[in-house]
Amino acid sequence: MKVNHSFLLLFLITLFCACTPKNIYYSTFSTTAIANKGMGVYVLRVQGIGQTYQQAKEDAMRKAVYDIIFKNVSSSYGEHRMIQPVLSNPLTEQQHADFFGSFFSAGGDYLKFVHELRLEKDKFKPQARRGVIMNVVVNRAALAKYLADNQIF
């Protein structure tokens, strides 16, 4: 009888622990250009989220390249101009889904056009999902040439 109660108690404790809320971070942080290095090279401040620190860094670099290709990126330097997206047609991503799927895959070609400048801050505790806000350098001109060479318009 004691064994049954022990198993029941252990089961209930496990069940209650599994039902506790998870620490998931949602943010409205937007990618911002903080410097223009000339020749189509920009320094961006971007946020990445992942289960590990390395995944969060990779997510940030992927997001920086994605935003340069598809979105207007606001600028916090000089005359506060927007950086126009490389591709202005919003349907291009859907039309070339296979290309962009492999381009943005882990270890994909997007890494040729971005590198970390320096880590800004690590905002999350080890037991939670990790997030980083970091500065990255994106070569927009080389990225535009690469997309044109692959006939992505």
Which residues are covered by each model-predicted region?
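Domain-level marker for long, solvent-exposed, non-transmembrane regions
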Residues: C19-F153
